[in-house]
Amino acid sequence: MLARYVTVLLVWLVGAVVAPAPPTPLPAAIDHAIQQVTVAELREHISVLASDRLAGRGLGHDGNKEAETYIAGVLREAKVIQAAPDYLQRVDVYSPRLGPAARVSISDAGKPIVELRVGPEFLPQPESSDAVANGPLLFVQHGVSAPSLGHDDYTNIDAKGAVVLALDGAPDVLLRSPQLSADDKADFAAIDRKAEDARAHGAAGLIVIRNYVGDAEGTWPSRPSVRSASFRLYGPMHDKPLAVAVISEHAIKPVRAALEQRRALTASLNPDVIAQPMAMSNILGMVEGGSKTAEIVVVGAHLDHDGIDEAGRIYNGADDNASGAAAVLAIAAAFTRAAAQGVRPARAVVFALWNGEEKGSLGAEYYVAHPQPSRRIVANVNLDMVGRDEDIPDPNDPRYRGFAKTHASDNVNVVHLLGYTYAPDLARAADVANQTIQLTVKQDYDRDSQNLVRRSDHWPFLQHGIPAVFLTTGLHPDYHTPDDDTGRIDFAKLERITEFAARLVWLAADGDAPRFRTQ
């Protein structure tokens, strides 16, 4: 009898230990406002943003401007406070185009040993400014300067005014370093990083040696569609001009031989990159906070998509990312309803609809450097593709390479949270926010070989040491195709994810400031 009693008591005690904690209550007004988010509201926003009339919201197209106007109008109608004049944060960008005069000449004692125009052996890069570089040619190994990691290819090299010649990829010593993540190693191999280091050392030009230069039409389409056009932010390339190009291993052979003989070579690099200016806008609303309103939490989603391709097909981008934009608009309306009843989080919350994500997170990158309002950003929650079920039928498809095969039927309740290795406090807050919603929140993509953690608008925040997480339901066969349409959205799931994200944003804005974990 005693033994049986003890057993029952132990079972009861163990059950008491492992029983889940009750959901953390939110103030009644915000809890009620969040529960008022409806499928109808989300459907209305996506039906407009992903309509053929907006033609895929591609940057540089009228449909993109119409999306900006629609979103600002929704915020205005919901009485969301403006975080920028008329909700619009202007962002100046440019589209680089290749001119006809691009060339490179490398000389030994005044005699050209390499002379090339655009072709399979030589190609200027979109990272280039339009400045012509003339100066001594200096070989700088991989062109990576990382003295804090014990490696600097510029040691004892005066690169001021020179054209530097660099190997492709990253130095072996950094690739083998246990201190560096796979993401860090990829950074050191990128041409943007080599250009940054070349500019920091005063170089006038950078030529990177590659096995395969690339297709000129692929890099510089003669008649770019909305989908293929590239855009960039004004910045270092114009403040400190640097000519940038790639050259083939084959073409550089005479130069290698001369450098091995320690001959003094000179180079003339004319990238002939023409910057065509354009303006776009981030759309910004906000609610003021309470005791910590000098700090802001940003919840955002990108409004743009791929536009129209060369064949005239429209990429409506219902999941990517009208779904995330609709969620942020619904969250903005919910927080504004609560604020109207006097219920606000401690910190201000900015509701951001970013532009230019498909061209490299241009709007988010600009905002991190120029926040509106000008306050300290303590956290970011990003929503990108939150309206479907992850479905990866063929891991060998280039779009999915590095991901495991999975079927939509196995992911009906799944949402992925990325950024957890950088923002563990936000990841824990997500667990709390999910107690009420009961989604299956997976944290398994921060280290995938596709670098998914870098491929959306939270990444500029993480790059600046700001805790950020990325919510997504994952990839599927309609990703970046004309078949990503409104009819394929799971609106009931999107509604739950919107409520989950809203609760997470409240917890981030009302609790202790989340910490950033350096990798």
Positions of PLM-derived features:
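Soluble metallo-hydrolase cores and metallopeptidase-like ectodomains found primarily
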Residues: 30, 107-109, 115-156, 232-317, ...
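Short helix-loop-beta-strand segments that form the rim/entrance of peptidase-like active sites
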Residues: 330-360, 375, 383
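Second-shell loop/turn segments in exported
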Residues: 28-36, 52-62, 77, 124-128, ...
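A conserved hydrophobic secondary-structure block that centers on an alpha-helix together
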Residues: 141-218, 294
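N-terminal hydrophobic or amphipathic helices/low-complexity stretches enriched
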Residues: 21-82, 218-219, 287-289, 296, ...
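Noncatalytic luminal/extracellular "stalk/propeptide" segments of secretory-pathway proteins
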Residues: 55-177, 280
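Metal-dependent peptidase/peptidase-like ectodomains
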Residues: 115, 155, 242-254, 259-260, ...
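His/Asp/Glu-rich mid-to-C-terminal helical/loop segments that flank catalytic regions of hydrolases
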Residues: 247, 333, 472-519
